[in-house]
Amino acid sequence: MASLSGPISPTNLEMFKPGVEELNPSKLLLLSNHQEGMLYPTILGSLELLSFKRERSLNLQRDKVCLLHQESQLLKLRGTGTDTTDVLLKQPMATSVNCCHDGIFTIWEQDRMPKTSMAPTLTESSGSLVTRLMSIPRLTFSIGTQVAMRLFRLGFRLARYSLRVTILKAQEGLLLIPDLLHAHPVEPLVQDRVVEPILATEPLPLV
């Protein structure tokens, strides 16, 4: 065995060379065609690295590739009061040609993406809501009043207390409706309508 302190011959240098398997151009072409859609460069190395890339490419071919390169467009909308939740869900699935090197995530199927926005949407304005609430037949209120008075006369303390609280909160809401209409202008029909608070015809009995 040659001494380590002496000069190292070329034959001894062969012992320190890492074992790298050379690949012919035809095999490299086959690998590049097989790894279609992958944007990382092919590095000549051991077969373990190539087998890892081959397995990863098969998994990506089975999945659909979704990109994050359009995030920069959404960042421009941030701070302007624009809700980007719906925009994120409606971004089309891009092809592998536009893949970013550092931002790739995969999903199983594109069809399983939620089609609707998760943000709550208002289906009607406050004016139409007030109009709909005030168009409830008076028969409903009369029936409720009769039931409440019967429960008051029966003497159930808990029922009387609950009904009294409910009636007081309803009267408070009716008193606040005109102020809310002036503070928040809505449709002209609601603005022109005179909203008068409904006063109780009988004093509420004490609980």
UniProtKB/Swiss-Prot annotation:
CDD domains in alphabetical order: embe-CoV_Protein-I_like
Please name the Pfam families in this protein's record: Corona_I (PF03187)
Q: Which domain of life is it from?
A: Viruses
Q: Which InterPro entries match?
A: Corona_nucI, N2-like_embe-CoV
The primary site where this protein sits is virion
KW Metal-binding (keyword) present: no
Q: What is this protein called?
A: Protein I
Q: Output the lineage of the source organism.
A: Viruses, Riboviria, Orthornavirae, Pisuviricota, Pisoniviricetes
